[in-house]
């Protein structure tokens, strides 16, 4: 089926549709990963976004039962140069096309993804829409310009009810802003007794659970849209150790008086170098975020910058001067990507153990 991708800036890309035969609109972003498309599709942080894969051939190893990061995809669409029709991997169960049909998702292949990525890199992320080949381009552009996307992405992907993932070790309350299953896997491997709660849970409700530590998960959207979470974090600081990842990192920054801003085209992929300022060591990290903590705004707060991105020198890590609280902008659980930084989960375990003494 013939499809085309139309950007609000007027550019049009013609290609072949795959998956469900439907039109879909979202914020168009790019991801530089060569692999990990299954985790990407099921990552709640991509809620409302159409993702362009910069690597030219996607779908090579199909879809398996193990690599999902959530039960239902939140992604709006996928853009690839070429989609693999005959995947080859011993774990393959279905093809990428079959997954998109099953989950009622729309994608487009056969377009110049290098040109699209250059547009996004130079102009910044834009709104876009995958439409049928006969759709009127001028009308679609005007629709995109006048469209305001929802700002309740966290509410869309957060759990609605609390649930437990039992373990024999330290009790961790995981606040779900759109958490990947990889975070739960890393905590479970360290025998943590995990309770997953909704993003709108209050500090008082969390403290009644008597946790040893709080994990603030990744999630989609603008961190400033989560004012209730800031009150929750302020109510927990100093009372229990806190570890924030991605959106959780940004929320800690806001809760402590810093500011955030929207990046031009974000960091998305499994090959982003980050410098640990305390250890003077570089880790290759998995990242997926369109916002960052403003480094200038850290002045006058109780936060210390601990990590920076080597590509653009933006903030990638924070630590509280007084309270047991730290966070990183990238994904130490990887899923997908390098596991250089999963030692941070061990640091969190140590922080909780020391706090109990």
Predicted regions and their residues:
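Active-site glycine-centered loops adjacent to acidic/histidine catalytic or metal-binding residues
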Residues: 112, 246, 289, 331
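Catalytic beta-strand/loop cores that center a nucleophilic Ser/Cys/Thr
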Residues: 281-323
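RNA-binding accessory domains that recognize and position tRNA/RNA substrates
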Residues: 1-204, 208-209, 223, 335, ...
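Beta-strand-turn-beta hairpins that frame and shape the catalytic cleft
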Residues: 166-172, 279-282, 320-325
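Residues that mark the start of a beta-strand
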Residues: 169-173, 193, 241, 284, ...
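Cysteine-nucleophile active-site neighborhood
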Residues: 213, 217-284, 292, 337-347, ...
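Active-site-proximal beta-strand elements of phosphoester/diester hydrolases
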Residues: 171-176, 285-286, 326-330
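Proline-centered loop/turn at the N-terminus of a beta-strand
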Residues: 106, 171, 241-243, 259, ...
């Amino acid at each position: 089926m013939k499809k085309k991708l139309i950007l609000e800036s007027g550019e049009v890309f013609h290609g072949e549709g795959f998956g469900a035969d439907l039109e879909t609109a979202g914020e168009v972003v790019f991801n530089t990963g060569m692999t990990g498309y299954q985790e990407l599709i099921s990552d709640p942080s991509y809620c409302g976004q159409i993702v362009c894969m910069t690597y030219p051939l996607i779908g090579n190893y199909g879809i398996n039962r193990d690599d999902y990061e959530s039960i239902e995809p939140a992604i709006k669409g996928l853009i690839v140069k070429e989609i693999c029709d005959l995947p080859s991997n011993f774990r393959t169960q279905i093809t990428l096309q079959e997954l998109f049909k099953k989950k009622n998702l729309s994608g487009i292949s056969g377009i110049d993804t290098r040109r699209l990525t250059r547009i996004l890199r130079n102009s910044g992320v834009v709104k876009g829409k995958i439409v049928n080949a006969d759709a009127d381009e001028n009308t679609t552009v005007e629709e995109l310009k006048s469209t305001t996307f929802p700002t309740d992405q966290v509410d869309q992907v957060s759990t609605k009810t609390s649930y437990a993932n039992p373990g024999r070790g330290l009790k961790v309350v995981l606040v779900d802003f759109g958490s990947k299953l990889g975070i739960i896997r890393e905590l479970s491997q360290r025998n943590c007794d995990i309770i997953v709660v909704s993003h709108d849970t209050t500090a008082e409700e969390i403290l009644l659970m008597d946790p040893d530590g709080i994990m603030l998960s990744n999630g989609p959207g603008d961190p400033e849209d989560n004012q209730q979470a800031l009150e929750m974090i302020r109510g927990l600081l100093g009372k229990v150790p806190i570890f924030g990842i991605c959106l959780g990192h940004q929320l800690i920054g806001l809760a402590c008086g810093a500011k955030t801003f929207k990046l031009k085209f974000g960091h998305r992929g499994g090959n982003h170098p980050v410098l640990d300022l305390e250890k003077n060591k570089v880790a290759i990290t998995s990242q997926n975020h369109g916002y960052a903590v403003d480094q200038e705004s850290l002045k006058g707060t109780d936060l210390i910058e601990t990590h920076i991105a080597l590509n653009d020198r933006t903030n990638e890590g924070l630590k509280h001067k007084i309270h047991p609280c730290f966070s990183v902008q990238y994904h130490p659980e990887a899923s997908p990507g390098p596991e250089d930084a999963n030692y941070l989960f061990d640091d969190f375990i140590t922080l909780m153990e020391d706090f109990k003494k």
